[in-house]
């Protein structure tokens, strides 16, 4: 009995370190039925409830105005709103995990790797290495933190039918990982339209709470929007839907500390931006630009080599690095 109590105490301690289960709101007039309604609305943590607007909670079928007020009050008690010093936040940032890209030069450019708890957008033309980088990250995120991994699973949403599990197996061999275990640790799904894409992100919230995931990939985030919303007449509707989708991704990154990686396509820039020698820009407009924490621009080099440029980042300087697409994933470019 004492051993069981110790196990329960350890589980509770581990739970306190991560997001709080929405079941902690049960008490008083808040019942298990109310909690189920919140979970059906993809609100699995107290943090997600505390960060939701009153309007969003009122829209949940079965929850009345009085009950919503009580839920908000209890959630704010567990997750109080307030300020912290920049020094405290600086210390918290020191613990942020970064995932290796497979290339030492690319990791150096990124200050260590792909940052967890934020959205990284990777854009470029076809065959520039976006999907190959995603496949490599799907494996490296499973490595121990001491080996520049995230010690977690990967969630992979494919919208263009480019996911290949055999590619993961080859990359797993490179890192001397068990192929079957690596494949088991990647939750894969296909999205065929933008509504499905959003629905899958809602489903992801529950999966992230139930198990340890280090990485969420959407390859590509914009492809389905380009086919579902055609012409200027649907542009406003597309951007509104896209904004909702990206806010959901940011919420998952904030709550679960997962690295969110999305790929994007480019289009010709009619005004010549970003430069007179490379008149291409990522699609998605200002909504995509402001939602992505870090934006990486990939372009082709000679042979298997590719070039990555820091297009936008809150802390990284504008710079470039060369990497290569190798049989066993992304790696450093070989000297010719």
UniProtKB/Swiss-Prot annotation:
Any one GO biological process: germarium-derived oocyte fate determination
Biased composition (Polar residues): 1-10
GO cellular-component term (any): condensed nuclear chromosome
Positions annotated to bind ATP: 124-131
InterPro entries in the cross-refs: AAA+_ATPase, DNA_recomb/repair_Rad51, DNA_recomb/repair_Rad51_C, DNA_recomb/repair_RecA-like, DNA_repair_Rad51/TF_NusA_a-hlx, P-loop_NTPase, RecA_ATP-bd, RecA_monomer-monomer_interface
Superkingdom in the source lineage: Eukaryota
Main localization, broad class: nucleus
Region (Disordered): 1-20
UniProtKB keywords: ATP-binding, Cytoplasm, Developmental protein, DNA damage, DNA repair, DNA-binding, Meiosis, Nucleotide-binding, Nucleus
Alphabetical list of PROSITE patterns matching this protein: RECA_2 (PS50162), RECA_3 (PS50163)
Keyword Oxidoreductase: no
Compartments it resides in: Nucleus; Cytoplasm
Tissue specificity note: Highly expressed in ovaries.
GO molecular function: ATP binding; ATP hydrolysis activity; ATP-dependent activity, acting on DNA; ATP-dependent DNA damage sensor activity; DNA strand exchange activity; double-stranded DNA binding; single-stranded DNA binding
Protein family: Belongs to the RecA family. RAD51 subfamily.
Function recorded in the entry: Plays an important role in homologous strand exchange, a key step in DNA repair through homologous recombination (HR). Binds to single and double-stranded DNA and exhibits DNA-dependent ATPase activity. Underwinds duplex DNA. Spindle genes are required for each of the symmetry-breaking steps that generate polarity during egg axis formation; oocyte positioning at the posterior of the cyst to generate the first AP polarity and inhibition of gurken (grk) signaling to the follicle cell layer to polarize first the AP axis and then DV axis. May have a role in female meiosis.
Assembly mode: Interacts with Rrp6; the interaction is required for the recruitment of spn-A to the DNA-damage response foci.
Protein name: DNA repair protein Rad51 homolog
Source lineage: Eukaryota, Metazoa, Ecdysozoa, Arthropoda, Hexapoda
Gene: spn-A
């Amino acid at each position: 009995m004492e051993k069981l109590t110790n196990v329960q105490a350890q589980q509770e301690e581990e739970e306190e370190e991560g997001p709080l289960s929405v079941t902690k709101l049960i008490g008083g007039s808040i019942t298990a039925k109310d909690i189920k309604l919140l979970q059906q609305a993809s609100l699995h943590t107290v943090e997600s409830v505390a960060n939701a607007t009153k309007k969003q909670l009122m829209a949940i079928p079965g929850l009345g105005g009085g009950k919503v007020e009580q839920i908000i009050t209890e959630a704010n008690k567990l997750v109080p709103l307030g300020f912290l010093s920049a020094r405290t936040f600086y210390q918290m940032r020191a613990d942020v995990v970064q995932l290796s890209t497979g290339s030492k030069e690319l990791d150096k450019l990124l200050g260590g790797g792909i940052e967890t708890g934020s959205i990284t957008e990777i854009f470029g033309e076809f065959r520039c290495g976006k999907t190959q980088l995603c496949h490599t990250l799907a494996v490296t995120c499973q490595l121990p933190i001491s080996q520049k991994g995230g010690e977690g699973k990967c969630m992979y949403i494919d919208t263009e039918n480019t996911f290949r599990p055999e590619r993961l197996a080859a990359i797993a061999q490179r890192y001397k990982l068990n192929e079957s275990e690596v494949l088991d640790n990647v939750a894969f799904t296909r999205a065929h339209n933008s509504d499905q894409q959003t629905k899958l992100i809602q489903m992801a919230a529950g999966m992230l709470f139930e198990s340890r995931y280090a990485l969420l990939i959407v390859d590509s985030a914009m492809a389905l929007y380009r086919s579902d919303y055609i012409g200027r007449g649907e542009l406003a509707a597309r951007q509104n839907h896209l904004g909702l989708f990206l806010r959901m991704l940011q919420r998952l990154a904030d709550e679960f500390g997962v690295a969110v990686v999305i790929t994007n396509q480019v289009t010709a820039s009619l005004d010549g931006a970003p430069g007179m020698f490379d008149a291409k820009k990522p699609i998605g407009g200002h909504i995509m630009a402001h939602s992505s924490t870090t934006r990486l621009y990939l372009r082709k080099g000679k042979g298997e080599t590719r070039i990555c440029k820091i297009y936008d980042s809150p802390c990284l300087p504008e710079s470039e690095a060369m990497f290569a697409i190798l049989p066993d994933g992304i790696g450093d470019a070989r000297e010719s």
